[in-house]
A protein has these predicted regions:
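Radical SAM enzyme core and accessory elements
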Residues: 177-250
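Conserved non-cysteine loop/helix-boundary elements of the Radical SAM core domain that shape
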Residues: 1-148
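Short amphipathic alpha-helical surface micro-motifs
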Residues: 1, 69, 96, 169-174, ...
Length: 250
């Protein structure tokens, strides 16, 4: 974060989000560093508040640990916190998902993002057709979860402000971000509108540059794997002159 501060005038930034991640990776020292180096918004992601489901999907934290991390962030002064949950997780039920949504609402974050399970092609779940026939992964059951989330969140002043879909999503359903008024994630809106340049750093990063006059979008992709990123770094930097030229004209 110090490197970012040296490279960018963060005093001009309207929103500075840090993906704090899962409860088992968050520490007080990390949150203090995030707070003291200019971040204005963080995301803490339980995915579910059901310990049995967390275990089933290989997560190493518990709902209680998430609650502790959330409370810690509040005590440290964070006043714009997003939480993520996923509808359709293996072994989850409508009642379990309902409990997750209700508990998140009670914790009173500024925004809640409701994702629908997307099964990656490399995942074991994708390879097993039988898994998709289990009751908890039927289109109807997941639709019921998503509909409940909409009703409960809007009833508690969380308004939907952005939506997107991914491939292999259960029921071809969507991911929806809900936020309290004035707490919408600007990055999410601008990205969906294809209205924001992205400067990506590190392995698997994707830079996107938008020409304001022509609307042309140019993308540059970093190598995915760290060993490849390191060994082919010079070749990858071949687009740097074009990037610098673009930025100098902004």
């Amino acid at each position: 974060m110090k490197t970012i501060e040296k490279s960018i005038d963060i005093s001009r930034i309207r929103e500075y989000t840090v993906e704090a991640g899962r409860a088992d990776t968050i520490t007080e020292d990390k949150l203090i560093a995030v707070r003291d180096n200019g971040a204005t918004r963080i995301s803490i992601n339980p995915q579910t508040m059901q310990d049995g489901v967390l275990k089933a999907i290989g997560r190493n934290h518990t709902a209680a640990q998430f609650e502790e991390c959330f409370s810690l962030a509040r005590r440290l002064g964070f006043d714009n916190i997003n939480t993520d949950t996923i509808a359709g997780l293996p072994t989850d039920t409508f009642e379990g998902f309902k409990d997750t949504v209700d508990r998140l609402i009670a914790m009173d974050p500024e925004s809640i993002t409701v994702h629908t399970l997307t099964v990656k092609r490399s995942a074991e779940l994708f390879k097993s057709a039988e898994s998709f026939r289990d009751g908890y992964l039927t289109d109807d059951s997941v639709s019921r979860m998503v509909n409940y989330a909409y009703d409960a969140l809007t009833r508690n002043d969380f308004m939907p402000y952005y939506l997107y879909r991914q491939k292999n999503t259960v029921g071809n359903l969507e991911n929806v971000g809900y936020a309290k008024k004035g707490k919408e994630g600007l990055y999410n809106v601008y990205i969906m509108e294809e209205a924001q340049n992205i400067l990506a750093c590190g392995a698997s990063g994707s830079t996107k540059l938008i020409d304001r006059e022509t609307g042309k979008i140019t993308r540059y992709f970093n190598y995915k794997y760290p060993y490849e990123y390191i060994s082919r770094y010079e070749k990858m930097m071949g687009y740097k002159p074009e990037l610098e030229k673009f930025l100098s004209g902004m």
